[in-house]
């Protein structure tokens, strides 16, 4: 799969538009984007910023043992998060994604966090897509579509109140998982918000 689309960048008013739709401070929304991806949804090659989660790939291949064994042998899957470090650089990440897609396209795309908000492909239904490939195609098209995916996830995951109230610890736990404190995700959100407020 070619992961290059139109790669349209956000306009400043896009933040305000989506923030108004969510009824949140645009600085709070920008803080999340800054912590997740540095505020940019595309890499230098015009592909959506992505992170391949090998432990999810392992999990999603559980009912396909031959594929799971192949993925493990190729270093693309393992049972627990953190067993191996993430690859450095977007090209290395996409090399893993491409290799995983050759094993199982759907499971591979579901195992990646995509774009500005780093929304897991497995959450495609939560953000309004019947098919993960459609979610990825929209992420390839524009940062605005990536931002809308993030907004839909925030609403679907029940995190809107936390973002509106700038309850960074509760938001971080819901958005980034129970390990958020390990990386000081809540502190990073508060610091980023202070820069934009």
Regions found by a protein language model. Give the residues of each.
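Catalytic glycan-binding domains that act on GlcNAc-containing polysaccharides
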Residues: 1-197
């Amino acid at each position: 799969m070619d992961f290059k689309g139109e790669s349209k960048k956000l306009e400043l008013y896009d933040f305000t538009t989506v923030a108004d739709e969510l009824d949140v401070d645009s600085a709070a929304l920008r803080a999340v984007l800054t912590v997740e991806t540095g505020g940019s949804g595309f890499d230098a090659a015009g592909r959506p910023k992505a992170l391949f989660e090998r432990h999810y790939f392992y999990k999603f291949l559980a009912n396909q043992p031959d594929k799971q064994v192949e993925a493990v042998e190729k270093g693309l899957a393992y049972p627990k998060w953190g067993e191996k470090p993430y690859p450095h650089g977007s090209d290395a990440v996409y090399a893993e994604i491409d290799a995983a897609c050759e094993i199982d396209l759907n499971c591979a795309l579901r195992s990646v966090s995509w774009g500005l908000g780093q929304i897991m492909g497995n959450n495609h239904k939560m953000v309004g897509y019947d098919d993960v490939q459609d979610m990825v195609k929209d992420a390839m098209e524009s940062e605005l579509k990536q931002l809308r995916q993030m907004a839909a996830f925030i609403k679907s995951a029940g995190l809107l109140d936390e973002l509106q109230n700038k309850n960074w610890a509760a938001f971080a736990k819901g958005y980034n998982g129970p390990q958020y404190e390990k990386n000081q995700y809540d502190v990073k959100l508060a610091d980023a918000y202070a820069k934009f407020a």
